[in-house]
UniProtKB/Swiss-Prot annotation:
Keywords: Amidation, Amphibian defense peptide, Secreted. It comes from Xenopus ruwenzoriensis. Coiled coil: none annotated. The keyword Cytoplasm does not apply. Expressed by the skin glands. Belongs to the gastrin/cholecystokinin family. GO terms for cellular component: extracellular region. Its main location: secreted. This is Caerulein precursor fragment-related peptide R2. It is found in: Secreted. GO terms for biological process: defense response. The modification Leucine amide is found at L17.
Length: 17
């Protein structure tokens, strides 16, 4: 669902940091 997409985006964001 949408929560899954949000979690993915957060994971990618923290990866970039």
């Amino acid at each position: 669902g949408f929560g899954s997409l949000l979690g993915k985006a957060l994971k990618i964001g923290t990866n970039l940091l």
